[in-house]
Regions:
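Conserved active-site alpha-helix within GNAT-family acetyltransferase domains
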Residues: 97-98, 118-136, 141-145
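A short beta-loop-alpha structural element at the N-terminal edge
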Residues: 10-24, 156
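Conserved beta-strand in the GNAT
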Residues: 63, 69-85
């Protein structure tokens, strides 16, 4: 008998023999959500084969079942909730909440997830359960090339989770700044070798403006007037570093 009582659900980790049913539920859910989510970019048989080949030693797949069988699933890899799907005919009955609470119990220190920007029902669901939106992108990093949002549940110690996220971003930022400085230096070398003007005297305001505009388009959120002064400093300091290196 079907029920909307989440206490009637049973949860268990998936076994390889379950993955065919997981693929069925995934395909049904994505089809039913066509107004909120873009279509998958690969043929259904390829998607099915991919799901049926999941390595359950790397990817945790948790099933929600009742007396009628599989009604939902969630997948976790490391500190990421990679997916959470409920059978279309069982949505709105507390199953998604139960799966999300299961994920919270399995990852008490917090986890992140990606959701399409167009999927407003899912974004609202996650916000109601305490998740926060941390990042918006133009979708160039996902197969569908559709704008998406990185959300996070910061766990039972939110400040610790968020500061760890900042530390991770700063580590990547340091690497990117080093690359930016090196590339700026290489460009100045090419300029001067061709008889042009390098350093601060050779700054190209039109190109710098185009860089800022491209960055703002790529990652919606920070406005041009916020990004422009940051890039002015980054470019300026990289040029100063190049000029200083020529005096050594």
């Amino acid at each position: 008998m079907r029920t909307d009582d989440p206490d009637a659900l049973a949860f268990r980790p998936a076994e390889p023999s379950d993955l065919s049913q997981v693929a069925d539920l995934f395909l049904a859910s994505r089809t039913a959500a066509s107004e909120a989510m873009p279509p998958v970019t690969r043929p259904w048989d390829v998607v099915r084969g991919h799901i049926e080949a999941w390595d359950l030693g790397v990817r945790e797949v948790w099933l929600a079942e009742d007396a009628m069988g599989l009604v939902g699933f969630a997948t976790l890899t490391g500190s990421w909730l990679e997916s959470l799907y409920v059978a279309p005919e069982r949505q709105g009955m507390g199953i998604g909440t139960a799966l999300l609470e299961l994920a919270m119990g399995l990852r008490p220190d917090g986890f992140g997830l990606w959701v399409f920007a167009s999927n407003t029902p899912a974004r609202g669901f996650y916000r109601r359960h305490g998740l926060i939106e941390l990042e918006h992108t133009d979708g160039s990093g996902n197969p569908e090339r559709e704008p998406d949002v990185r959300m996070a549940w910061p766990g039972h110690a939110p400040m610790t989770y968020l500061r760890n996220e900042i530390d991770d971003v700063d580590a990547h930022l340091a690497e990117l700044l080093a690359r930016r400085f090196a590339l700026t230096a290489a460009v100045q070398g090419q300029k001067t070798a061709a008889g042009g003007t390098g350093g601060h005297a050779g700054r190209d305001s039109e190109r710098e403006r185009a860089i800022v505009e491209r960055m703002v388009r790529h990652v919606p959120g920070p406005e041009t007037d916020r990004v422009a002064p940051i890039m002015d400093v980054v470019i300026g300091e990289s040029l100063t570093a190049w000029e200083d290196s020529r005096q050594d």
